[in-house]
C-alpha cells in the first residue's frame, strides 16, 4: 500500500485515514483507532489488528507497519505501509496462553492467573465493594480414600462447574489447588447471605457416577471496598474459612472490612 501525502497537512492526513478506517467495517471496532494513530505517527508500529472476512463472522489477524518518507525539505512525502497475516501463529500463541492460565483438571483459572486478574481489577476499581470467598470440600480426603482419586477428581470437576453456574459470568472462579477454590464476586451489596446461601443450598444438584456420595462445603467470605491486594484479602477470607471449620463445617463465615 503506497499513499501520496505531498502537500497535505497533518490534519488532512488524519482526517483522510480516519475516514478510511472508519468506513472499513471489516476491521474490529476497537482496533480502528490504532490504525489511524499508526498512519498519523502517533504510535510506532508494528501493530496487531483484527479484521473480519467479508460476509463472515470468522476473522484474520494481521500486523501492520507504516514508514514515512520525507523529501529534501523535510516534508512528509509518502507513507509506506506493510501488512502480514499472522492468524495461524496468533491463534497458536493465544491457545498456549490460555492453557498456561488454566488449571488442567477443572479448566478454571489457576492461582497465578486468577491472582493477577483480581489484583488488576481491584486497581481499576479501588472504591468498589467486592467479596472474596474461599471454600473447600469437607472431609475430601475421606472421599479419595473411600472411592479413589478418579472419583475425587470427578467431584472437583463437578464442583467447578457448579460454581461457574451459580455465579455471575463476570465473577472470577479459581482452583487454588487440592479441593480449595476461590470465588471473587464483583460489585456486591452489603448483605452477602443470599449469594452464600445459594452456593450452599444447591449442592444436591451435583450428580456423580457414585450416587451414594454425600458431601458438603465450608466457606470463608471477606467483603471490602478499598484498594487491597489478593494476598491480603485471601488471608482474611481463609481465616473465615477455618472459623467455619471450627464451627462444625457445612457453613459459612462472613468477615466485613473494619
Label for each model-derived stretch:
Residues 37-40, 157-227, 232, 254:
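GGDEF/GGEEF active-site signature
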Residues 61-104, 112-122, 172-175:
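Signal-transducing coiled-coil linker helices
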Residues 97-101, 110-131, 138-168, 174-178, ...:
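Conserved long alpha-helical elements within nucleotide-processing catalytic cores of c-di-GMP signaling
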Residues 3-25, 33:
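PAS and related sensory helical modules
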Residues 40-65, 75-77:
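Per-ARNT-Sim (PAS) sensory domains and their PAS-associated C-terminal
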Residues 24-50:
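Terminal output helix/cap of sensory domains in signal transduction proteins
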Residues 72, 145, 222-253, 258:
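Catalytic-core segments of nucleotide cyclases and related cyclic-nucleotide turnover enzymes
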Amino acid at each position: 500500500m503506497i499513499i501520496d501525502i505531498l502537500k497535505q497537512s497533518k490534519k488532512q492526513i488524519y482526517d483522510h485515514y480516519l475516514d478510511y478506517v472508519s468506513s472499513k467495517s471489516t476491521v474490529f471496532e476497537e482496533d480502528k483507532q490504532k490504525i489511524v494513530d499508526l498512519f498519523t505517527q502517533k504510535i510506532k508500529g508494528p501493530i496487531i489488528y483484527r479484521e473480519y472476512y467479508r460476509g463472515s463472522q470468522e476473522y484474520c489477524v494481521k500486523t501492520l507497519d507504516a514508514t514515512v518518507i520525507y523529501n529534501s525539505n523535510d516534508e512528509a512525502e509518502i507513507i509506506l505501509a506493510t501488512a502480514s497475516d499472522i492468524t495461524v501463529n496468533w491463534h497458536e500463541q493465544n491457545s498456549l496462553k490460555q492453557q498456561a492460565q488454566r488449571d488442567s483438571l477443572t479448566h478454571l483459572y489457576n492461582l497465578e492467573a486468577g491472582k493477577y486478574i483480581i489484583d488488576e481489577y481491584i486497581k481499576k476499581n479501588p472504591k468498589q465493594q467486592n467479596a472474596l470467598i474461599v471454600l473447600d470440600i469437607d472431609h475430601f480426603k475421606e472421599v479419595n480414600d473411600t472411592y479413589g482419586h478418579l472419583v475425587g477428581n470427578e467431584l472437583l470437576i463437578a464442583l467447578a462447574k457448579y460454581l461457574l453456574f451459580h455465579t455471575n459470568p463476570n465473577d472470577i472462579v479459581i482452583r487454588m489447588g487440592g479441593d480449595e477454590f476461590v470465588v471473587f464476586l464483583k460489585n456486591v451489596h452489603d448483605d452477602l447471605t443470599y449469594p452464600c446461601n445459594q452456593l450452599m443450598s444447591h449442592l444436591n444438584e451435583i450428580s456423580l457416577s457414585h450416587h451414594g456420595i454425600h458431601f458438603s462445603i465450608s466457606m470463608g467470605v471477606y467483603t471490602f471496598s478499598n484498594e487491597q491486594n489478593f494476598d491480603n484479602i485471601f488471608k482474611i477470607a481463609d481465616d473465615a474459612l477455618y472459623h467455619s471449620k471450627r464451627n462444625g463445617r457445612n457453613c459459612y463465615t462472613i468477615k466485613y472490612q473494619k
